[in-house]
């Protein structure tokens, strides 16, 4: 085997390993957050410390990589990146973290998978295009799967999950709106620059949000936590946020975005496994059927999009 071929094999193997580790780390996010909640942290505090710890690390990544500015960039693009960051890194996670306080990590991960459903709806409205029968069937199948995942006809279980589900579905909708309206910014200014500016804006928005809540008398404990809690905050910021970004970035460089997306689809399955192993969470049979249905339909939609090279 020639040296060039061996080099390509090593690159592909390294890229796959990077992506697998990144997916494993990112999939554990809900588990660490759940542990923080069990130790007494509030959703606002978890998100605030995640932002404060992640922002300088994203700027460090920016300085290390020093990505060149893409051609044709406009001055307003950086401001758009900040605006996009408020939605993608502040509002969407805030709704998700609040919702996760009311549902299991398993259910939360499946609900977050619904974002392609919102992307589909927003794109159809934007482009004013009629959907195909196949797409409409997929939408109805996902909606029915989500209904089952929340408890289906078990009224008590369904009601217990409803509050959290509303927040998490809103989080998915906000993220989908970001993808439809601002997804092109990744190509215009680059993913590293978008994350640095966006996360900075999100951190500022989070501090403003907590300040407004404090002024309104809705104080959330932000300090006086035990040392172990700050360790959890650091893990959430570094292990489940920054490290996955770097590993996926390096993995995509080596094996391409399509193969990377295929590997990352294992994330929801890993979260469900973590929830059962580390949190002792369990799903009823109806919920398992619903989660499985949502996973396979959404995965099928994403695979078809990857195969056809379709972009929103």
Swiss-Prot record:
Topology versus the membrane, per the UniProt entry?
Answer: Multi-pass membrane protein
Q: Where is the EamA domain?
A: 173-303
Name the domain of life. Bacteria
One annotated Gene Ontology cellular component of this protein: membrane
Sorted alphabetically, which keywords does the UniProt record give? Cell membrane, Membrane, Transmembrane, Transmembrane helix, Transport
Q: Where in the cell is it found?
A: Cell membrane
Q: Does the keyword Hydrolase apply?
A: no
Residue ranges spanning the membrane: these are 13-33, 45-65, 81-101, 105-125, 133-153, 162-182, 198-218, 229-249, 260-280, 283-303
Family label: Belongs to the EamA transporter family.
Return the protein name.
Uncharacterized transporter YcbK
Which organism is the protein's source? Bacillus subtilis (strain 168)
What gene, per UniProt, encodes this protein?
ycbK
